[in-house]
Amino acid sequence: MTVFEGRFTDAGGLRIAVVVARFNDLVTGKLLSGCLDCLSRHGIDVAETSSQLDLAWVPGSFEIPLLAKRLASSGRYDVVITLGAVIRGDTPHFDVVVAEVSKGVAAVARESGVPVIFGVLTTDTLQQALERAGIKSNLGWNYGLQALEMGSLMRSVPA
């Protein structure tokens, strides 16, 4: 029996794209900081001149799948990380955005064969979002770790 597992220490040659929503940037900026910290501590060059990492900003979470698809389909990246924050309001808008971004990100991964990490927070309040972006823990770090594991795993599984 063969067992396939991703390793966090096999990140050296990975090419990673990160798509970040500007809307709720108080939250998404913190997620990005946590994500970049994780990637850096695991050997990914996160400098502005990096050839391993590209960063793309979109207006909001709804736009994430479109750009994630373009990046994943380019053949340049081993993994794409998506970061956003959708916070419930008084209208059904939350439900529409959350449904479309989650389905869209999943579809990009299935169609492209490139792992796409779903790092879009879906919370009822700003406080909940902030707790997940750094007050209690920073899920951006976890999303970075998931990207490293999936990038490594995909390299180890024969096509």
From Swiss-Prot:
PANTHER family: 6,7-DIMETHYL-8-RIBITYLLUMAZINE SYNTHASE, 6,7-DIMETHYL-8-RIBITYLLUMAZINE SYNTHASE DMRL SYNTHASE LUMAZINE SYNTHASE. Its EC number is 2.5.1.78. GO terms for biological process: riboflavin biosynthetic process. GO terms for molecular function: 6,7-dimethyl-8-ribityllumazine synthase activity. HAMAP family: Lumazine_synth (MF_00178). The gene is ribH. 5-amino-6-(D-ribitylamino)uracil binds at residues 23, 61-63, 85-87, 118. Catalyzes the formation of 6,7-dimethyl-8-ribityllumazine by condensation of 5-amino-6-(D-ribitylamino)uracil with 3,4-dihydroxy-2-butanone 4-phosphate. This is the penultimate step in the biosynthesis of riboflavin. GO terms for cellular component: cytosol; riboflavin synthase complex. It comes from Synechococcus sp. (strain RCC307). The active site is at residue 93. Gene3D superfamilies: Lumazine/riboflavin synthase. Pathway: Cofactor biosynthesis; riboflavin biosynthesis; riboflavin from 2-hydroxy-3-oxobutyl phosphate and 5-amino-6-(D-ribitylamino)uracil: step 1/2. This is 6,7-dimethyl-8-ribityllumazine synthase. (2S)-2-hydroxy-3-oxobutyl phosphate binds at residues 90-91, 132. The keyword Chloroplast does not apply. It catalyses: (2S)-2-hydroxy-3-oxobutyl phosphate + 5-amino-6-(D-ribitylamino)uracil = 6,7-dimethyl-8-(1-D-ribityl)lumazine + phosphate + 2 H2O + H(+). Belongs to the DMRL synthase family. Keywords: Riboflavin biosynthesis, Transferase. It comes from the Bacteria.
